[in-house]
Amino acid sequence: MSKKRMSFRVVCCFIALFLILAVSGCGLFIETIPKGEIPGKAPEDRYVMIDHVNYHYLEYPGAGPDIFLLHGFASSTYTWEKVIPYLTGQGYHVWALDMKGAGWSDKPKDTTYDTITLMREVNRWMDVMGLKHVVFAGNSLGGAVALLMTLEHPDKTDKLILIDSAGYPIKRPFVIRLAKMPFAAEIVRLFFGRWVVKRTLKEVFYNDAMVTEEKIDAYFSRLSTENSLYANTALARSLDFDALSSYTKRIPEIKNRTLILWGKDDAWIPLESGYRFSKDLANEKLVILPECGHVPQEEKPEQTAKIMIDFIEGR
């Protein structure tokens, strides 16, 4: 085969790939949502600028105690939207934050996204909001931040609610392992689309029927914001269990009343981690939800909310 014909075929292959990506709504052809814009913004959507980062959060005022809800990896305040009405119905003052790099918050490139840095930034946000002695509920990565906050800033937390929490070494999910590959950010940007979101959600849910078009759209829109893919790749690359080992060794020091809530069929952080938290925490209650995956607050919101409320009220 002549070099001329070979070059022609290579060009044709690139053109074909370009067209396939274009018509499938992948990476380079996805419209980016500018920072600071929230489609369908609600009255509870708020922003605050702290250290040059514009943080998005939700606030639902109430006469009861402050409950602070913190999301996991590649997630946002959206993950709590089905649980919040039950909590506000009890009169609690509910807060939920998009950490730097997540949801509708800014996703700067000139920064780091490791867990300890995120914890320090959450603490700074709580200072600005004037929050202390909150009921701190964290899912996945948010649970790890809750644990670090309890150890480093005990004045910020009262009761703890760990929902399928990160903390102990585990086998990283595929999407996080992918971030360790060379040129991961560029590859993700090229192929990212609704199909990636759908595939990932089906990993974290036990019941595939819960992965609705509305849910896919909610995650996809937030991951389509400016610098989102960069921020999530940087966060995934920075997940370092060795760096956190000095903290996980101190978990037995925590004396806060703690609810450990786990989806029995969690494919991202297995139930073994839930049992380990139960063993290491002195003042804990472990509740396991059958036929439930990594995000009980989305898959079984009514049950999750009832368990949370009973725990908060001491029932």
Which positions does each model-derived feature cover?
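Alpha/beta-hydrolase fold catalytic core
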Residues: S2-P65, G89-Y92, L131, E313-R315
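Active-site loop/oxyanion-hole signature of alpha/beta-hydrolase fold enzymes
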Residues: I50-D51, L58, G89, M99-A137, ...
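Conserved HGGG/HGGXW glycine-rich cap/lid loop of the alpha/beta-hydrolase fold
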Residues: Y60-W104
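Flexible "cap/lid" loop of the alpha/beta hydrolase fold
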Residues: L151, L160-L190
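Conserved alpha/beta-hydrolase catalytic His-Asp/Glu region
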Residues: R177, F191-P252
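Short beta-strand/loop motif that positions the catalytic acidic residue
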Residues: I254, I260-W262
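Acidic catalytic loop of the alpha/beta-hydrolase fold
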Residues: D265-I269
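Catalytic active-site module of serine/aspartate enzymes centered on a nucleophile-bearing elbow/loop
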Residues: E284-R315
